[in-house]
Amino acid sequence: MFEPVPDLNLEASVELGEVNIDQTTPMIKENSGFISRSRRLFAHRSKDDERKLALRFFLQRLYFLDHREIHYLFRCVDAVKDVTITKKNNIIVAPYIALLTIASKGCKLTETMIEAFFPELYNEHSKKFKFNSQVSIIQEKLGYQFGNYHVYDFEPYYSTVALAIRDEHSSGIFNIRQESYLVSSLSEITYRFYLINLKSDLVQWSASTGAVINQMVNTVLITVYEKLQLVIENDSQFTCSLAVESELPIKLLKDRNELFTKFINELKKTSSFKISKRDKDTLLKYFT
């Protein structure tokens, strides 16, 4: 039915020289192993190398960590290099180990902070790879103390804020001694504000613990931040009647305003940074 086209009916002779496969040597950085690129984001020699490369990718977002803290987190990941944690999605193990290690040092991230600095973790909708599920799996595999990441203990979340506004001359890893008074004050305000909401039956019980904590912390942070901007603009002072045992260190906040602003702006970029006008108006009643 079909006739061959003469112009395309070509023949060619190809001569190959003698090649001894055993005598060939791979180029530098050439990997002799096969890695399916559909399953590995970073094609590397081992899963351990892949985790470290992933950690470097994620940690660059935590701009407020110094080189000693970053080195410490790499050592923590290196300590579990022979442990198989997940069959797939190996790169996601590194940021979870970092989060749990930072939490062991007294600093945790709210949902908004997680979205700001680890959006891949926050936006994971798979039931198997959801945040709480992954935390539980890694705690079990690595022998960490088992427990929920988000609990009604506000100090660790404000400790992360303190990390972000630290003085450049801080000594020691995850050292926030100079900012400890701020952590105590913000925590006290949040505890009392939470109790006020409980008594008024304003807490949304259908929401998760992480969501409730996120709402409380965001409301306190943005309220204090906006009051601080007014104080700086008008060269005045402000107090909060909920901070009974630990007054707000206004001078510290003024001195670190640039760092505080940078941190708040990172949170504002997220979709989870939503402030209830009712909650904010209620909290503002206690500021003078």
Swiss-Prot record:
<keyword id="KW-0805">Transcription regulation</keyword>
<keyword id="KW-0244">Early protein</keyword>
<dbReference type="Pfam" id="PF04745">
    <property type="entry name" value="Pox_A8"/>
</dbReference>
<dbReference type="InterPro" id="IPR006834">
    <property type="entry name" value="Pox_A8"/>
</dbReference>
<comment type="similarity">
    <text>Belongs to the orthopoxvirus OPG134 family.</text>
</comment>
<comment type="function">
    <text>Acts with RNA polymerase to initiate transcription from intermediate gene promoters.</text>
</comment>
<comment type="subunit">
    <text>Heterodimer of a 45 kDa (A23R) and a 32 kDa (A8R) subunit to form the virus intermediate transcription factor (VITF)-3.</text>
</comment>
<keyword id="KW-0010">Activator</keyword>
<protein>
    <recommendedName>
        <fullName>Intermediate transcription factor 3 small subunit</fullName>
    </recommendedName>
</protein>
<keyword id="KW-0804">Transcription</keyword>
